[in-house]
Amino acid sequence: GFRVDMAGSLVKNDPESKGTIALWQNIREFLDEEFPDAAMVSEWGEPDKSLIGGFHMDFLLHFGPSHYNDLFRCDHPYFSKDAEGSAKEFVAAYQANYAKTDGKGLICIPSGNHDMDRLAKNLDTDELKVAFAFLLSMPGAPFIYYGDEIGMHYVEGLTSVEGGYGRTSSRTPMQWDDSLSAGFSAARKDKYYIALDESRTCQR
C-alpha cells in the first residue's frame, strides 16, 4: 500500500478540498484497476474528506482540531499519572469524525511519526503500557512508529539533519538488540546518518 504525506495539501485555493478530493478519487480508481489489493493511507487529519477522496485510512494527527496531542504530547497528557490531563475534547472530535465516516474507511490513531516527539518523552514505562492498550484497542488500524513499541527515546540535543531540527531527535536508529550498534548497522558510529541513542535503556 501507500502512505501519502500531507495528502490534503495538493490543490491551492481549495478551502473545501473539492479539487484535492477529485484528484485522489482518480488515483484510487487507477489503483483499484491495477493493484486491487493495495491500501491507501493518508496523512490528512480530516477523515470525512480523505475517505471520500478514496483513501482506505486516515490518521488523526497533531495538527488540526483532533486534540490528539491531549493524549500524549502536552504538559499534562491524558495518559500521565498526574491525572491532570483530559481526553474530553479528543473524544468529542473523534466521535464526530466517526459518525461522519462509519463504514467508509478507518480512522487511525498513530503512536507517532517522524515529525513528532516520541511517546517516551512525556510518558514513563507504565504510562506507555496504558497508552498502547488504548492505541491497540481503538476502532481502526493501529500504526506504531518504529521504536515506540520498545520505548525508544526522544534524544535531546542532536545535530539537525536535512532540516529535521527538533524532529531529528525522534529519528534515531532502530534498536533491534543489545549489541554495540543495536543491530542497526555494522558501520562505525561516526558514519551513522543520525546518532544512536547511547542510553540504551529501552533494551532493558
Q: Where are the regions that the model predicts?
A:
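Non-membrane alpha-helical structural segments and their capping/turn regions in soluble enzymes
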Residues: 17-21, 25, 84-91, 125-129
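Active-site neighborhood of glycoside hydrolase catalytic domains
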Residues: 1-50, 72, 100-103, 108, ...
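Short low-complexity stretches enriched in small and charged residues
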Residues: 63-72, 97-103, 130-131
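Acidic, His- and aromatic-enriched active-site or binding-groove loops in soluble protein domains
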Residues: 24-31, 57-80, 171-174
